[in-house]
């Protein structure tokens, strides 16, 4: 199962790499944290893409690097959960781009999060994050707070 950068994975001290990534991320060193992760396996590639998407949300820069990392993660995803997690990140990056006025990608955000909902089972660990992001899109892009509660 792929863990995104938002999962808090690695904060227990069990994995030195994840601890280093978490520490860098908590200091807003997203590119440095992403550079530690190998881009040749599905879970680390997805975590790398999530870190770079988070950087875009907070700094409004690095969009191309985040897109490249996301394409890599999508290409490496094999299982439905991995593909769903990659679609969730694609939706979140599209949401961030729309929110910051970089480009209107609201339709892409909704479509990607819908794909993710079809691929990620309700009991999966990544489902709560997906539902939260669907609520963000409903509330902030569609302007329908009631739909956010349903998501």
Residue ranges and their predicted role:
Residues 36-59:
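Short, charge-rich amphipathic alpha-helical segments embedded
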Residues 18-22, 34, 50, 74, ...:
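Amphipathic alpha-helical repeat scaffolds
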Residues 1-31:
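Actinobacteria-biased recognition of intrinsically disordered, low-complexity terminal regions
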Residues 21-24, 53-68, 94-110, 138-149:
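Short coil/turn connectors between adjacent alpha-helices in alpha-solenoid helical repeat scaffolds
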Residues 31-40, 62-78, 104-118, 145-151:
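Alpha-helical repeat scaffolds
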Residues 11, 43-46, 81-88, 125-127:
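Residue signature of alpha-solenoid helical repeat architecture, marking inter-repeat boundaries
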Residues 15, 19, 47-54, 89, ...:
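"A position-specific structural signal for the A-helix of alpha-solenoid helical repeats
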Residues 92, 98, 115-118, 122-151:
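Conserved binding/catalytic microenvironments
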């Amino acid at each position: 199962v792929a863990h995104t950068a938002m999962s808090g994975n690695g904060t227990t001290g069990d994995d030195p790499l994840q601890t280093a990534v978490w520490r860098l991320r908590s200091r807003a060193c997203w590119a440095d944290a992403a550079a530690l992760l190998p881009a040749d396996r599905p879970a680390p590639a997805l975590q790398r893409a999530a870190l770079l998407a988070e950087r875009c949300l907070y700094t409004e820069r690095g969009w191309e690097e985040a897109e490249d990392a996301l394409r890599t993660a999508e290409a490496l995803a094999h299982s439905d959960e991995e593909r769903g997690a990659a679609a969730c990140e694609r939706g979140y990056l599209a949401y961030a781009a729309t929110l910051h006025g970089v480009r209107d990608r609201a339709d892409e955000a909704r479509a990607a999060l819908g794909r993710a909902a079809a691929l990620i089972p309700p009991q999966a660990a990544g489902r709560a994050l997906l539902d939260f992001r669907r609520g963000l899109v409903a509330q902030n892009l569609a302007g329908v707070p009631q739909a956010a509660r349903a998501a």
